Amino acid sequence: MKLIFTFLLFPLLTATQPIINCKEVIKPYEDFQSPLAFEETVAALQKTLNSKGITIFATIEHHKAAEAVGESMSPATVLIVGNPKVGTALMQENPLLAIELPLKILIYEKEKTVNIRYEKISATAEKYNIKQNFGTAEKIDTAMQQLIKLSIGKLKN
C-alpha cells in the first residue's frame, strides 16, 4: 500500500517545482565587448556616467587589491553607480531591494579582451516582486545599456 501511495504522490510532488525562474524570463546580465584598453574603458565609463548625472559611489579595483596581498589576477574593476532620484521608487515599493542597490558594472579583461557586464535591475526587481515600478527598472536598464555603449563608442551621442 505504501508503495502505491508513493507512486501516486510522486507526480504531485514533482509538479510543484517551478517551470521557469527569473533568469529564464529576464537575462540577469547584459554583456558588452569594449574596443578600448582596460584602463581606457574604465575611464570612459566613469566620464560618461558622471556627465549624465550618475553618481559613482565606489570603484573597486579587484586586481589592485589582489596585488596588495601578493596575489595576481586579470584586471577587474566594479563601478557601483546610481541615481537616488530614480532608484528610490524601487526601494519604496520593496525595502528589501535596497540590499541590491546601487547598480553594479563590472569591467574585466579575459584573454586580452576587455568586457563589460551590467547587472540588470529589471531582473532583480522581478526577483523582489516589484510591480508598480517595474517600468522604472526597465527604463534604468535601457539607459544604462545606452550609456555603456556610448562610452565605448558603440552608440553615437
Locate predicted features:
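Stable alpha-helical elements in mature extracytoplasmic
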Residues: 41, 45, 62, 140-143
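Compact, glycine-rich, soluble single-domain proteins
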Residues: 46, 50, 54-103, 107
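Bacterial Sec-dependent N-terminal signal peptides
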Residues: 1-23
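C-terminal partner/receptor-binding element of secreted or periplasmic proteins
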Residues: 122-157
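Terminal, regulation- and interaction-focused segments at domain boundaries
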Residues: 17-56, 149, 157
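Beta-strand/loop substructures that line and gate deep hydrophobic ligand-binding cavities in soluble
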Residues: 104-130
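Short secondary-structure transition/capping segments
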Residues: 19, 100-113, 149-157
